[in-house]
UniProtKB/Swiss-Prot annotation:
Signal peptide: none annotated. Residues 1-23 have a biased composition (Low complexity). This is Non-structural protein 12A. It is found in: Host cytoplasm.
Length: 312
């Protein structure tokens, strides 16, 4: 059952680049357009999460501040189109979003301070969120500057030490069991055989940088999932929603459900109950522009949501 009220997660931006809110200051909301997913809450405050991963079409324009007062976006789902099979280094994307990473880090710290973070006895959220994120961010940024190919996890020198050794040996051993289960679930339902010998996983989840333990685990698991590949546009969509779901779950979401709103248009709604004092966050997505794989991948997404729910 979803609770009513207001909460601190009423904000917008991409996972790696929070462009719309900084404290109480609004800078404008990205449009509901190609390459974005709309999110709404029951208090009619629109939230937009643009798909800024390199595997999504970028939204270049911004709508004026008045968008906030235009009402509930519940019936205005986003249509995502574009090429979701991107490969190659994502260095530019990461470097351009350094400020956004810091904003997301600040958001996480605020949530922790309000009791959404490391307060449980089973170590679901560790007290090292900020420290680990900062520890990994600087070395990884330096690797980027040195010419890392993020798609292969190896630097220009070809050793891969910057990602594989640092993340796997130094970070994963300090992660909580809960986060490990989340990441196991994160990858479980989207493992496809690579058709050309490599994976585009990195470009699909690169926007998770700066979010604390979860992004470190995504990084550490990268070397173990090289067979994972974005084989179609519909796969790209659900890889993105999967990552976003994991991110919100990490912040304390009580996972909701996937609802079909319009079978003919293949229009779906994903509801997440964030916290007891918050309205539910509602994702809406219209997948009617695609012709195959929708129902199959939605079943996978539902399984993922259920798995997260069982972990709580």
């Amino acid at each position: 059952m979803f609770k009513s009220g207001s909460g601190s997660l009423k904000r917008s931006g991409s996972i790696s680049s929070v462009k719309s809110f900084s404290g109480d200051s609004e800078k404008g909301l990205p449009p509901i357009s190609r390459g974005s997913v709309s999110i709404t809450s029951q208090n009619y405050e629109p939230l937009i999460v643009p798909a800024n991963s390199s595997s999504f079409a970028a939204a270049s324009d911004f709508v004026p501040e008045k968008t906030k007062s235009e009402g509930n976006l519940k019936n205005k789902s986003s249509v995502i189109t574009g090429n979701f099979e991107s490969s190659g280094p994502t260095n530019a994307h990461y470097n351009q979003n350094a400020d956004g990473d810091r904003l997301v880090e600040n958001l996480l710290l605020k949530e922790i301070a309000k009791g959404r973070g490391p307060s449980t006895s089973d170590a679901r959220h560790t007290a090292t969120d900020s420290r680990l994120s900062q520890e990994v961010k600087q070395p990884f940024s330096e690797e980027n500057a040195g010419g890392n190919d993020l798609n292969t996890g190896r630097g220009s020198h070809g050793t891969g030490d910057g990602i594989e050794q640092y993340h796997k040996s130094d970070c994963e051993e300090r992660m909580s069991a809960y986060h490990k289960r989340v990441v196991d679930t994160f990858f479980k339902y989207f493992e496809y055989s690579a058709e050309d010998g490599h994976s585009t996983l990195y470009s699909d989840v690169a926007f998770l940088f700066g979010c604390g333990d979860l992004d470190l685990l995504v990084m550490s698991r990268y070397q173990e999932v090289m067979t994972l590949r974005a084989r179609s546009a519909i796969y790209g969509i659900f890889c993105y929603l999967q990552a976003l779901t994991a991110y919100l779950t990490y912040l304390g979401a009580k996972v909701g459900q996937v609802i079909m709103l319009d079978e003919e248009l293949e229009k779906y709604e994903i509801r997440l109950d964030v916290a007891q004092d918050d309205d539910p966050i509602v994702f809406q997505i219209t997948t009617g522009v695609f012709t195959s794989g929708v129902a199959h991948d939605l079943r996978k997404l539902t399984q993922i949501l259920e798995a997260f729910s069982l972990e709580r």
